[in-house]
Amino acid sequence: MQRNGLIGDTIRSLGFLSRLPLPQGWFDNTDDSLPRNARAFPLAGGILGLLAGVALLIANAISLPPLAAALIAIGALAAMTGALHEDGLGDTADGFFGASTPDRRLDIMKDSRIGTFAALTLVIWTGVKASLLMAIIARAGAGYALLALIGTEAASRAGMLAFWHALPSARPGGLADSMGQPQWETVVCGCGLGLALLAIGFLPSGGMVALINALVLMTVVLFGFARLCMAKIGGRTGDTLGAAQQIGSLAALIGLVMAL
């Protein structure tokens, strides 16, 4: 089996994006360049969405209320990823709205302590995402909520990949800058995979309207967030990549719920 192929890239992407136990052999003697492996980010996201969806299905099967099932799915995602993207969202909120200069914003984003803006953002974000999953369960069923999680987690990581490619590093020499930047071919491949999984996740319940809604909303909000990043800190950091994923996932879910 080609360990530098798409399967290998998916496993190595899971190794970066999650804390799932993975075979070490897939990481030995391979081209493990993150910008190259990143084409498989949407596939890794789809796997994480599938596992979170299974948790939601189990919660629904044992007659837990939709709110509990939705929160369990959100918690499962955070547990599997080590809250990697949620941490980025919180740090971005603290930095962007807790300081008045780019350098000070970047300093705050590096601080591991959680501030008021981060706390409020994460509470509101979790509540909105849970309410959207509840709406999908109520209007279409838990099985379609599972499909929605697959599509959402895949497409949001494709959006994160495009965001990573489009913006310059805001902190030259920092950790995110040292990881490099994906090439255009990687972005095209990743976005194609993300679109395919989004279609699989959304078409059965919401049809083409849901798919178009999600694509338009994701494009608009990620473009707006990219402009905000340039205005606030002059580019991207690892935290803003995580925030982009969270923003994209919520936009996609809103697009689906609008169509149900």
Swiss-Prot record:
Keywords: Cell inner membrane, Cell membrane, Cobalamin biosynthesis, Magnesium, Membrane, Transferase, Transmembrane, Transmembrane helix. It comes from the Bacteria. Pathway: Cofactor biosynthesis; adenosylcobalamin biosynthesis; adenosylcobalamin from cob(II)yrinate a,c-diamide: step 7/7. Its EC number is 2.7.8.26. One of its GO terms (molecular function) is cobalamin 5'-phosphate synthase activity. It is found in: Cell inner membrane. Its main location: membrane. Its cofactor is Mg(2+). InterPro entries: CobS (IPR003805). The chain crosses the membrane at residues 42-62, 64-84, 117-137, 144-164, 192-212, 214-234, 240-260. GO terms for biological process: cobalamin biosynthetic process. NCBIfam families: cobS, PRK00235.1-2. This is Adenosylcobinamide-GDP ribazoletransferase.
